[in-house]
């Protein structure tokens, strides 16, 4: 974990390529650089919810609906990410369902 970094300098100098993931505290802080770098293949993930919420980076793309021109890559990535997060949460729940009971230390 590194940072924080100012968004304009971070993306402007290509630092994002040195990391596996970039976390922004605000939606608009990283949306423009994210879309410019990953348009057509990126996935938005909203953390901290009880449900898994992902979406393709292009949003609804209603201007392409019914025209046979949309690229499904970003939608597929969003679905696969949602499935991966769901499975990871299931695995975590399974691993932590029966924790060891705390023992009192002998004095």
Residue ranges: model-predicted function:
Residues 1-104:
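Glycine-rich phosphate/nucleotide-binding loop
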């Amino acid at each position: 974990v590194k940072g924080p970094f100012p968004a304009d300098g971070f993306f402007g100098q290509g630092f994002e390529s040195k990391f596996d993931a970039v976390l922004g505290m605000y939606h608009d802080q990283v949306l423009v650089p994210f879309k410019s770098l990953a348009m057509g293949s990126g996935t938005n993930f909203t953390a901290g919810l009880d449900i898994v919420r992902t979406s393709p980076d292009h949003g609804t793309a209603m201007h392409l609906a019914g025209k046979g021109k949309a690229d499904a890559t970003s939608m597929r990535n969003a679905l696969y990410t949602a499935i991966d997060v769901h499975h990871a949460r299931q695995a975590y729940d399974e691993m932590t369902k029966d924790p060891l009971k705390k023992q009192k230390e002998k004095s």
